[in-house]
Structure formats: structure tokens, C-alpha cells
């Protein structure tokens, strides 16, 4: 319960700091349950024309670590024939995977660090809006 509470608090802080940014999506809160918020992820809207690896690289230049959003299993090299079959059946998974990153979420992450990360995301997206 303590760890889930900590992770939910991190998600809340990210959400509060990024709320004014249009066309981004953070972990949704289900109506019939509680989001465990194990990994806080952000999916950039199509208006930014921003791929996840480009976002990770730009954030790394600001000393902000981020990781790729989950890849659809059928896109992995271990399943070379699966993409052709399953990508048309799973367009949403392939779409959001290409535009999503996972944000830092260490148990020792401070509020100041979350502020820094969110400022970096804002700079990244402001630069894309020019």
C-alpha cells in the first residue's frame, strides 16, 4: 500500500504540473478501479509529430532520463512474422507505442526532480510547437 501510494502521488504530481499542456495523455484513471501507477507514462499527441526515441534523446540532453513506452509484442524481433499479421489488428497499440515514453519514477524521486522533469517536457514540446 505504501509503494502504491507513493507511485500514485508521483502520477498526481506529474498530472498537476502538465495539466495545461494540450494533446498529451498520462495514465488514465479507471472508473471502476484504482490505477496502481507503477510506471507513469506520457503519450504525445499527433500534433507534436514526435516519436518516442526522439523525445528520449532530447530529454537526455536536458539530463532527464526516460524510457520507451511499451512496444507491442508482435513488433519485437523475437516474432518476425507477427507484425504483418497483428499490426492491422492492433492499430492503437502500434500508434501509441510510437509516441509514448515512460517518465522517471524511482521511489526516491523528489518533488523538485519532478518539477525539473516537467519543465523539460514543457521545453521539449514548446520547441516542437514553433
Give the label of every model feature segment.
Residues 1-130:
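PLP-dependent aminotransferase class I/II
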Amino acid at each position: 500500500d505504501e509503494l502504491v501510494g507513493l507511485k500514485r502521488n508521483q502520477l498526481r504530481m506529474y498530472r498537476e504540473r502538465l495539466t495545461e499542456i494540450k494533446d498529451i495523455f498520462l495514465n488514465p484513471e479507471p472508473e471502476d478501479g484504482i490505477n496502481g501507477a507503477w510506471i507513469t507514462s506520457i503519450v504525445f499527441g499527433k500534433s507534436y509529430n514526435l516519436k518516442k526515441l526522439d523525445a528520449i534523446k532530447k530529454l537526455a540532453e536536458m539530463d532527464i532520463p526516460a524510457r520507451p513506452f511499451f512496444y507491442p509484442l508482435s513488433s519485437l524481433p523475437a516474432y518476425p512474422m507477427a507484425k504483418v499479421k497483428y499490426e492491422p489488428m492492433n492499430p492503437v497499440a502500434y500508434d501509441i507505442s510510437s509516441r509514448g515514453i515512460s517518465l522517471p519514477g524511482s521511489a526516491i524521486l523528489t518533488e523538485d526532480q519532478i518539477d525539473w522533469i516537467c519543465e523539460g517536457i514543457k521545453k521539449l514540446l514548446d520547441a516542437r510547437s514553433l
